[in-house]
Curated annotation (Swiss-Prot):
EC number: 2.8.3.6
Protein name, entry field: 3-oxoadipate CoA-transferase subunit A
Keyword DNA damage in annotation: no
Binding site for CoA: 25-31
Assembly behavior: Heterodimer.
Keyword entries, A-Z: Aromatic hydrocarbons catabolism, Transferase
Pathway: Aromatic compound metabolism; beta-ketoadipate pathway; acetyl-CoA and succinyl-CoA from 3-oxoadipate: step 1/2
Enzyme class: transferase
Gene of this entry: pcaI
GO molecular function, one term: 3-oxoadipate CoA-transferase activity
Length: 228
């Protein structure tokens, strides 16, 4: 019997090792798997490379992980916000490495990994500092820069509901990077508000099929993470 549901955060996260590359879903705090991140902090893993759209907000979620010093590098498109002071302090002190990737390129590079593609050409970033040292190509009169896929050891994502086969449905904007990140990791761990019985999820509403998910863990979101 296929049963990908995990009883505890520790059970779901136990495979994560030091030095892992981890995709973390979310657009700011919307769709951020805060409880999975808290569980990762408790495990005490270190030398992590994190791939996410942002670099954390306040002292919550991803910022909380950064504050522990467990992250050696972050790959993101929007590292600085009014409340990104944790990342800002670490970066200015030389305690974290940053790779900035334009948001569209970030999504495309993750998608490329999930689809099993090799490097992709994109016009975004050509002629800027972000393209330095990368191969370029002129195609049909337009210049492109070559970008590598972003493949990860693990993906931590947040969905609305899931079943024991790993099928997931999302809620509104919380969906964001979740579906493509689930495809681009060797192991995908999804936190959900509820694990429902097989057949309860309308197949037409399933966005991420279970083939891309290895663990589903139900969590009760804290007030700070209760929003989509």
């Amino acid at each position: 019997m296929i049963d990908k549901s995990a009883a505890t955060l520790t059970e779901a996260l136990s495979q994560i090792h030091d030095g892992a590359t981890i995709l973390i879903g979310g657009f700011g705090t919307a769709g951020q798997p805060a409880e999975l991140i808290d569980g990762l902090i408790e495990l005490g893993r270190k030398n992590l490379t994190i791939v996410s759209n942002n670099a954390g907000n306040g002292d919550y979620g991803l910022a909380k992980l950064l504050k522990t010093g467990a992250v050696k590098k972050i790959i993101c498109s929007f590292p600085r916000q009014a409340d990104s002071y944790v990342f800002d302090e670490l970066y200015r002190a030389g305690k974290i490495e940053l790779e900035i990737v334009p948001q569209g390129n970030l999504a495309c590079r993750i998608q490329a990994a999930g689809m099993g593609l090799g490097p992709i050409y994109t016009p975004t970033g050509f002629g800027t500092l972000l393209a330095e040292g990368k191969p370029t190509l002129n195609f049909d009169g337009k210049d492109y820069v070559l970008e590598n896929p972003i493949k990860a050891d693990f993906a931590l994502i947040k969905a609305y509901k899931g079943d024991r086969w790993g099928n997931l449905v999302y809620r509104k904007s919380a969906r964001n990077f979740g579906p493509i990140m689930a495809m681009a990791a060797n192991v995908t761990i999804a936190q959900v508000s509820e694990v429902v019985a097989l057949g309860e999820l309308d197949p037409e509403n399933v966005v991420t099929p279970g083939i891309f998910v290895q663990h589903v863990v139900p969590v009760q979101s804290t007030p700070a993470s209760a929003a989509p």
